[in-house]
Amino acid sequence: MAPILELLPAVDVAGGQAVQLVQGKDGTGGRYGDPLNAALTWQNAGAEWIHLVDLDAAFGRGHNRELLASIVGKLDIKVELSGGIRDDESLNAALATGCHRVNIGTAALENPDWCAKVIAEHGDRVAIGLDVRGTTLAARGWTRDGGDLYETLERLEAAGCARYIVTDVNKDGTLKGPNLDLLRDVCSRTDKPVVASGGISSLDDLRALAALVPEGVEGAIMGTALYEGAFTLEEALATVREVAQ
């Protein structure tokens, strides 16, 4: 049996609430109540991972650090923690929650030396988020440009980055389907695992992503489709298992 595509339901937190944004734009999308309840719902439905995001920290307007730490502590499954991790203090706080790994985005673009140091020190506990519009990276809560995707990828490869989380910003929260060409392109330039994020709208989208596992796609982060009931997590897990058989 081939490797199964890992599914990471997203719990994005702003102002203490679970939310989902459209194209990363503040104030868009739905609100879904208590983030711990959301995370426990996905755990109980069979998730092995949660992608937990502090949107306030990502946008640079405070944080939900204590809340996120308490959520990590109450879950029995692996957590990937993301949002506003851009210096030693925020990184150490994130790692101290006991999360399985952290996702660093903006910092990788604004401070490559720090990023290389963190990759060297923490290895597999650090994934780098590549948030992409076309072939340009989007920085700090996606409100600014952050340079060329492939130049940055080359630099991160040289630094020994263990894993990439690739988001097509234009697809995120839109239910318009993932950017398979972008994922293939990134996979062709690295032998490290790639986690896909953005645009998943249907079980067919998951089948298409699962078909890219041999090329290097390891996982898929799902948000809006799950919260809006496009399919259940149980259906999603069954679908990716079928593809792997």
From Swiss-Prot:
GO biological process: L-histidine biosynthetic process; L-tryptophan biosynthetic process
InterPro entries (UniProt xref): Aldolase_TIM, His_biosynth, HisA/PriA_Actinobacteria, Isoase_HisA-like, Isoase_HisA-like_bact, RibuloseP-bd_barrel
Enzyme Commission number(s): 5.3.1.16
Main location: cytoplasm
Record: active site: D12 (proton acceptor), D131 (proton donor)
Domain of life of the organism encoding this protein: Bacteria
Recorded GO CC terms: cytoplasm
Pathway: Amino-acid biosynthesis; L-histidine biosynthesis; L-histidine from 5-phospho-alpha-D-ribose 1-diphosphate: step 4/9
Record Pfam families: His_biosynth (PF00977)
This protein's UniProt keywords: Amino-acid biosynthesis, Cytoplasm, Histidine biosynthesis, Isomerase
Annotated S-S bridges: none
An example molecular function term from Gene Ontology annotations: phosphoribosylanthranilate isomerase activity
Protein's cellular compartments: Cytoplasm
Catalytic activity: 1-(5-phospho-beta-D-ribosyl)-5-[(5-phospho-beta-D-ribosylamino)methylideneamino]imidazole-4-carboxamide = 5-[(5-phospho-1-deoxy-D-ribulos-1-ylimino)methylamino]-1-(5-phospho-beta-D-ribosyl)imidazole-4-carboxamide
Family statement: Belongs to the HisA/HisF family.
PANTHER family according to UniProt: 1-(5-PHOSPHORIBOSYL)-5-[(5-PHOSPHORIBOSYLAMINO)METHYLIDENEAMINO] IMIDAZOLE-4-CARBOXAMIDE ISOMERASE
HAMAP family hit by this protein: HisA
Protein's recorded name: 1-(5-phosphoribosyl)-5-[(5-phosphoribosylamino)methylideneamino] imidazole-4-carboxamide isomerase
Source species of the chain: Thermobifida fusca (strain YX)
